[in-house]
């Protein structure tokens, strides 16, 4: 009988979500899904107030103007740079002046790499200066540079097939762009795979959906036991040109010179501000973006926009005189571009309280006009998030997609905390990503207003609901 009872409970649990009779537990309380739907529906007026203030009202364009002031003043914010630390101190002051609570800096250790002077020139079959951007963490060349013949390949499979041709050469990858997740492996692993077959350097076709002769930088990693070789990204145009030349049987020779250096790790800070919860202050909805960037462009899109709509979300809640039941916590991460370095240390520092995190949110895919929210969590939590997103019907942004994305929140998501990220126009995003084109010109104030409204509504409602989002 005991077994049959538990079997009955399991069956009811499995089928009840669609019927509106799912049981959620918070302490000793039991609530049906219908009751939760009704609770969320009661936030309609609050959601409209947030939308009106952000998109049509007094504070429209505020996140855009705040962002422009920072990036025009400071510029790009590479991990380990003085620019990044200047930006952190400015944001620390800004958040205090904005009237947010518990504003503080949490110290972390981060990498310090500088690209130095760099150049690449094709000297055979003709003289042609290549636009390049060294990849983060790359070693430099000898002072005199490297002059070597080129081997062009379209994939790692082709590289292995032609391994006997690679020794002493510069491997040029002309991999096709499918999507970022699949194509970025060439940037991440290109140098290692080339070094394994004896190459002296690697040049990788930029991981981008479109190019107007623009190289795109990014993170790459070396592997223990494999020689380190210099590595950089080149433009799509030059990669395709060299592929055509090679297919005709032309010999290609490049002179590569890179002054990149890695210095000892240095101190930096994650920047934190809150609106303290009124009823469950120890419980948290985390809203975030990263403050660091690469050393090209202004870091406006990646990830100034995400950081500033996250700040704007708390500002909007504060400006409306709202105080959610649980704490809204803003975190502006440092050293995300080096693999979530600041976020990993935040996780280690705070994971003892993991049961108190209802939702972790990160905006790091641009702040163009969002089409919805990407979400990772239990089926119960997803059903709740669909109801929350229905409050954004006035903006026609109500969809909930699978798989929240965010280097900085993945630590929490993998540990079972529900996670959310903006669903954005990634095709357009990769026009500018990690390039000199990542400037305020890529930003649209009206689209930032909408993104901030979506972010604020979701964060506030989840933070103010009577119960935390249920986990698996």
Curated annotation (Swiss-Prot):
Residues 21-44 form a propeptide. One of its GO terms (molecular function) is carboxypeptidase activity. It holds the Pfam family Peptidase_M28. It is an enzyme of class 3 (hydrolase). Belongs to the peptidase M28 family. Residues 1-20 form the signal peptide. Coiled coil: none annotated. Its EC number is 3.4.17.-. Homodimer. The monomeric form is inactive while the homodimer is active. InterPro entries: CPQ, Peptidase_M28. It comes from Rattus norvegicus. Zn(2+) 2 binds at residues 302, 337, 434. Zn(2+) 1 binds at residues 290, 302, 364. GO terms for cellular component: cytoplasm; endoplasmic reticulum; extracellular space; Golgi apparatus; lysosome. It comes from the Eukaryota. The active site is at residue 336. This is Carboxypeptidase Q.
